[in-house]
Amino acid sequence: MVRRWLKLLGLIAALVVLAAACTSGDDGETAGEGEDAPLPEASAPVAAGGTEAGGEDGAAASGGTLEAVQSRGTLICGVNDAVPGFGFTDEDGNFAGFDIDFCRVIAAAVLGDPEAVDFQPLTAEQRFTALQSGEVDVLVRNTTFTSSRDGTEGGQFTTTTFYDGQGMMVRADSEFESLEDMQDTAICVLSGTTTELNLATRFGAGDIAYEPVPFEDNETLQQAFEQERCDGWTSDKSQLAGVRSAFPDGPDALRILDETFSKEPLGPAVRQGDPQWFDAVNWAVIATIQAEEYGITSENLADFDNTDDPEIARWLGQESEEDGTVFDPGLGLEPDFNRTVVEQVGNYEEIYERNIAPLGLERDANALYTDGGQLYPPPYR
């Protein structure tokens, strides 16, 4: 009797397993091997260039930006167009500045052509929406690396290109010598920025009553400041130095107060979820720093063509003297992309001297670690 019940229970168990296997097989045919079935209402994300994911540029929003950029032949770079020294348009209408040059660095590494860039000016409030939607491939727009931008905003920041801090600019003939002197004042500030938040934190901690006067872009903010609608203008000190250098009444008409009241590490940002693109952009940036450490510039690059240093030879994409191979780190870039970056755009020092030095800003934290700064390139091997 017991054996009959055991046989019956075994038969029931077998039927249950068979039914489960059939159900699993149906799901597999619908969704593909090892994948969850797609939601029927989901629409394809929009990629850089405006096409849906799956189209010519579809990978740009769905996780294959490197391939999409190389297929398109153009890098779409989100930038600022109103900050002297960092991102602006010159007298001829051409984009120029430190951030603009790093867009060119990325294009040189990825496409072999620093001019293959479509610059897309964005306001502070537009920038992360443009990045998330795929309107731009990369954001190089004096943007601070923060936890919420890394998390909530969906950005992923590469190596920092400029270490900055927030300051306050006032008219030279004003009575203000410190932030504590600015009780009951109106402060011009860009909306949707860490600057706005830092201002509230610092003035709140100092019990300094003030009226924030927010603007969406630097142009309207500067107009308000020139019209004396604000007593002070707060932003990253590098940006204030840029504005001061090109102020209509001359730089001596303005003063930047001594206090720095925030940390502002600035650098390129890409979308989360695309590690290959992150790696490509990150190592393009690192190339400029490594070149400076090696002492390689756009002017003396040819002197290293027959270098005896195996480390530099590897970095330049030269054949190994030992086995004749060329090192490929698997970044999806040409083996000599470092050389291309330096040859066509320059090393970090050249980029800095071209754009930031004229503003009167010392290297400080933006010097190599060997000179007391924070620029420290990781090994290329």
Which residues make up each language-model segment?
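Extracytoplasmic small-molecule ligand-binding "clamshell" domains
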Residues: 50, 57-139, 333, 368, ...
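Bacterial N-terminal signal peptides that target proteins for export
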Residues: 1-9
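Bacterial lipoprotein signal-peptidase II cleavage site
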Residues: 22-35, 51
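C-terminal motif of bacterial Sec signal peptides marking the signal peptidase cleavage site
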Residues: 17-21
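Bilobed "Venus flytrap"/periplasmic-binding protein-like clamshell domains
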Residues: 76-85, 95-110, 144-146, 164-223, ...
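Extended ligand-binding regions for polar small-molecule ligands
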Residues: 23, 42, 47-55, 59, ...
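Alpha-to-beta junction loops
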Residues: 75-76, 113-115, 133-141, 145, ...
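Acidic, polar ligand-binding/catalytic clefts
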Residues: 104, 108, 112, 116-181, ...
